[in-house]
């Protein structure tokens, strides 16, 4: 069995040794759920790495977006250079799911651009968990989405050995069966090329190596690892393992059976539609399904093959799909593995929200004859199914949610001390009545020292107006909101760090992982307005944005002190005292964190499948109909009569948005 081994000159410091010891002991005692409550900058990843090394179990690390997953992957790969550290996220650079809009009779075909590097890494991840014990997979929510059967993936691989008796053409046929293609000109991953008795194979999990198999009559004479670009031999091998080029591979007998059961379901569905007089839907489902069946029978594959996964894997209706987690169970660990859920207060709700979002879209496709009902079984796991598959779990967060605290039975391991000595920012409460002018004075102080300021407001309108006002009085300010796309978000945050502007204003600056050491002041307007963005957890997370700077300060602008504010202040003060006591005892003088400007990319959120917005910047969309518009117009007039002009303007903007969406969907408007 392979053992995990960390290679680094760093040693655990501060709270890390205690946290590592407690978590390891908890696992040894059989505690299935534990919480690591670690503040920003306390080295939580290093702690988790040490736990992995000591418990020596295959580990699944789940992050709530691709970029944070990539950051964790990079850190763990550096710490474990001789173990298998893998990356498993959605392989789509662009993803438009298949959908149907009944109101306009609009069918949107699935459209996707697959990232070849990520596809390779997914193959590498599944192969590692199936064949190794010393494996860490850093994944996004993709790990609960359906892929093909691990048993089929393993049983259909091709193993080749020097001296093995096999015909060249028989081997080529096997490669085609597991979806490799012949490519003489463009030799790429998932392809093979033939030159007489020499066959080069570029396996699905390989990056910078390929294999050369040399035949003599009906025997493998030699096997080499080669450079795929130059074709030069690197080393001689005795044996190679070629996994399928897709996770959706099916043995021929099961494929034949699957086509029979698809036919049976198709006949039932045609009958269902005809009995209801829905001839168009009956014709549609027959035409579309028969086209796919023809491709499956000829090539073993078709566009949207995942929609037939229940038939292809032989599962019963309603049974959960195979996921990455099933591959872990099928490997050497047999399910004895560790799961680490990073930023659990965000990731846990996201995992829980995947199933319903996926089902509602597919339900419409089924109802209107675009897909068979069995397509609903190509889905992510429900939260209960996910829970059932977990073994040992560590939830990692600076502000763990109620679910994590309850599941752990209060077994919370704290990591409050930062090895750098940085102390949590001091929180001040000031009156909201003069917040704009008061903050202006504070901004001038920070700008004169070359520091930056973050400001959070209650509404987007207020963020925009505040930005305009500060700009007119000579402050270099910008605002950030949910309508700004990922790439522009990168640039804005990068420019803030570079000093191209000094003040960033927004509604939701709750970005766990935001690395902005130049920020010395976080101002929270209307901190006493209770709600998700002013909850205890949100206030602590937002305040944490100033924790990387030695001059870090937080100002709560409020006319009253809410329960959430009180708890956030008390918790921050508790953490400050622990850190200051440690600093005094060890003679540590804290310094502002120094990080390269390029690191800003690690803080940008990318969507993976349908990312659930746990933190919303505005209310859920209204229903798209004229009744809604009339109702909102009445509310707008009422607000104007009461001299609530800002509220009236917000309602007016919502009405414009609804009308714009209705027109885009081809819906009639008479108001």
UniProtKB/Swiss-Prot annotation:
| Helicase C-terminal domain segment(s) | 435-601
The name under which this protein is listed is UvrABC system protein B
What is a single cellular component term in the Gene Ontology annotation?
excinuclease repair complex
Function description: The UvrABC repair system catalyzes the recognition and processing of DNA lesions. A damage recognition complex composed of 2 UvrA and 2 UvrB subunits scans DNA for abnormalities. Upon binding of the UvrA(2)B(2) complex to a putative damaged site, the DNA wraps around one UvrB monomer. DNA wrap is dependent on ATP binding by UvrB and probably causes local melting of the DNA helix, facilitating insertion of UvrB beta-hairpin between the DNA strands. Then UvrB probes one DNA strand for the presence of a lesion.
Location in the cell? Cytoplasm
* Motif window: Beta-hairpin: 91-114
CDD domains for the chain: DEXHc_UvrB, SF2_C_UvrB
Provide a Gene Ontology MF annotation, just one: DNA binding
Helicase ATP-binding domain segment(s): 25-178
Description of its domains = The beta-hairpin motif is involved in DNA binding.
PANTHER family the UniProt entry points to = UVRABC SYSTEM PROTEIN B (PTHR24029:SF0)
Recorded family membership: Belongs to the UvrB family.
Q: One Pfam family name from the record?
A: ResIII
- Which NCBIfam families does the record cross-reference, listed alphabetically? PRK05298.1, uvrb
């Amino acid at each position: 069995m392979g053992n995990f081994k960390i290679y680094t000159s760093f040693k655990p410091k501060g709270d890390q040794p205690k946290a590592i010891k407690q978590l390891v002991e908890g696992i040894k005692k059989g505690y299935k759920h534990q919480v690591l409550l670690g503040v920003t900058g306390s080295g939580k990843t290093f702690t988790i790495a040490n736990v992995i090394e000591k418990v020596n179990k295959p580990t699944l690390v789940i992050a709530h977006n691709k970029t944070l997953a990539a950051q964790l992957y990079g850190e763990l790969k550096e710490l474990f250079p001789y173990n298998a550290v893998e990356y498993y996220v959605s392989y789509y650079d662009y993803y438009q799911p298949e959908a149907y809009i009944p109101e306009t009779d609009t069918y949107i075909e699935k459209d996707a651009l697959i990232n070849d590097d990520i596809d390779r890494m997914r193959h590498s991840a599944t192969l590692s968990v199936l064949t190794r014990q010393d494996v860490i997979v850093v994944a996004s929510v993709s790990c609960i989405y359906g892929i093909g059967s691990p048993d089929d993936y393993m049983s259909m691989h091709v193993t080749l050995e020097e001296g093995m008796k096999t015909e060249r053409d028989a081997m080529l046929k096997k490669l085609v069966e597991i979806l490799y293609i012949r490519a003489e000109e463009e030799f790429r991953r998932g392809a093979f090329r033939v030159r007489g008795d020499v066959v080069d194979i570029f396996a699905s999990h390989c990056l910078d190596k390929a294999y050369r198999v040399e035949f003599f009559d009906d025997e493998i004479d030699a096997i080499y690892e080669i450079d795929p670009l130059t074709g030069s031999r690197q080393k001689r091998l005795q044996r190679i393992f070629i996994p399928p080029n897709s996770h959706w591979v099916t043995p021929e007998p099961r494929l034949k059976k699957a086509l029979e059961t698809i036919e049976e379901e198709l006949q039932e569905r045609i009958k269902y539609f005809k009995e209801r007089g829905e001839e168009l839907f009956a014709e549609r489902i027959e035409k579309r399904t028969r086209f796919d069946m023809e491709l499956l029978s000829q090539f073993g594959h078709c566009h949207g093959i995942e929609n037939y996964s229940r038939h292809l894997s032989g599962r019963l209706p309603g049974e959960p799909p195979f996921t990455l987690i099933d591959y872990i169970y099928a490997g050497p660990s047999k399910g004895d593995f560790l799961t680490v859920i990073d930023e659990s207060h965000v990731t846990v709700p996201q995992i829980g929200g995947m199933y319903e979002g996926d089902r509602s879209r597919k339900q419409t496709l089924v109802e209107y004859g675009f897909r068979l009902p069995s397509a609903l079984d190509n889905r992510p796991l429900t939260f209960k199914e996910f829970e059932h598959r977990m073994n040992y779990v560590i939830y990692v967060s600076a502000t763990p949610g109620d679910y994590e605290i309850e599941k752990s039975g209060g077994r919370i391991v704290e990591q409050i001390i930062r090895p750098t000595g940085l102390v949590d920012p001091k929180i001040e409460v000031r009156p909201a009545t003069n917040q704009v002018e008061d903050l202006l004075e504070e901004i001038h102080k920070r700008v004169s020292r070359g520091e930056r300021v973050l400001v959070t407001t209650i509404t987007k309108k207020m963020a925009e107006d505040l930005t305009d006002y500060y700009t007119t009085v000579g402050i270099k300010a910008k605002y950030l909101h949910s309508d700004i796309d990922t790439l522009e978000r990168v640039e804005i945050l990068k420019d803030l760090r570079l000093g191209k502007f000094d003040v960033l204003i927004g509604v939701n600056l709750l970005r766990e992982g935001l690395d902005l050491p130049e920020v010395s002041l976080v101002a929270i307007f209307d901190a006493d307005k209770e709600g998700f963005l002013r909850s205890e957890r949100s206030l602590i997370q937002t305040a944490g944005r100033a924790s990387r700077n030695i001059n870090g300060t937080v100002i709560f602008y409020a006319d009253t002190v809410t329960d959430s504010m009180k708890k956030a202040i008390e918790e921050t003060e508790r953490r400050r005292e622990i850190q200051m006591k440690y600093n005094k005892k060890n003679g540590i003088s804290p310094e502002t964190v120094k990080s390269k400007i390029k690191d800003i990319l690690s803080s940008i959120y990318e969507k993976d499948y349908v990312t659930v917005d746990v933190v919303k910047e505005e209310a859920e969309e209204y229903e798209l109909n004229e009744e809604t518009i009339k109702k909102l117009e009445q509310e707008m007039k009422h607000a104007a009569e009461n001299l609530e002009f800002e509220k009236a303007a917000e309602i007016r903007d919502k009405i414009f948005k609804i009308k714009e969406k209705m027109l885009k969907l081809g819906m009639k408007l008479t108001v």
